[in-house]
Amino acid sequence: YFPFDRQARRIAYTGNAAIFPRNKFFDEGQARRNVLVNDSVLDRPADTILASEFLEGRNWDTISDPERKVKSHRPITPFIGISSGSDVYNEPSSGGIARYLYPPKSSIYERSALGPNMISDANTTLNAVGRHHTGGDDSYGGTSNFVFADGHVARMTILQSVEDRLWGDRFYSMSGNNLVNT
C-alpha cells in the first residue's frame, strides 16, 4: 500500500518558476500554459538562477499556505505581470512589449515583515527565499545560496539577486509572449 500523495513532507530548496513550471500544464480558465524548458533555450545560463534555499520560519510556516499546507514543492515565481501582478497566468499573451517585470524593491520585505505564508504572498513569492547565512544587512536580513543554470553557486541577498536581474530575462516555462522587461 502506497499513500496517494508521494511528495516529500517539505524540502529546503526551491527552483526558479521561470525554468521549472508548476505541475499544471493546461487549465481552460487561464490565458497561459506551463511548458517544459530545455536547458539549451536559456540565453545566459551563467547569469540565470536555477534554484535557491527556502526561508526557514517557525515550523516552516513561511512555506505554508493560509490553510497550513506546506507548499515547498512550488517553485519561486520571480516575476510579476505588468497588468496582472502576481497572478502571472492571467497576464495577456499578446503584444510586442515585455509582459513581465521584476518586482519593485518595495515588494521585497524587510526581515521584520517576514512571517507565515511567504510562499503564497500576493506581492511576490521571492519573499520565501532564505536569508539565514551571514552577510546582508540589518534591514533585509542575511544571504542565501543561489545555484545558477551553468552549475556554479553564489551567495548573495535576495534583494541583490533582483537588482542584478539574475532570475532571467524570459519566463521560459510560460507560453506566449514571455519576455521580461529587464
Label the predicted regions:
Residues 1-182:
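Short, well-structured segments within or immediately adjacent to enzyme catalytic domains
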